[in-house]
């Protein structure tokens, strides 16, 4: 297994530790800080694995499969933790998670089609990813600040900001999902 794939695999391995610290705020001191550090390391591996794979000609089918899967597992885990903690609405999270499954399904169908179509990320998909990652990071940081007493949830609109960020992510997620369905409807018709 090459270095790029090891970094991708590390991201998957970090997910349960991230979830543990996110959900152990009552037991582990500074658990949100630890979760943020793990999320940051996982995010860095996401950038590093692709750059290393391309620069050193380490692109593999395993990496092409595992990299987007690792991203989805990390983001979906964060969003589920947010719902459990009351930081995000279940319906917003459900829309984001459903879109991930739908687009992944479209990609699998396209890749398995006669034309072996590879679906690249669209600008809407990139905006969706960026908005979701920003939302996750900002929401965790706000709760770290509350945890450390730097701000209070009563004086600072933590939940309102969290909701706005998640709604923006949800809107971009919905637009992106509809665009994928529209752009690749022929692939779906052919293989349905």
Predicted features by range, described:
Residues 1-192:
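Alpha-helical transmembrane bundles and membrane-interface segments of multipass inner-membrane proteins
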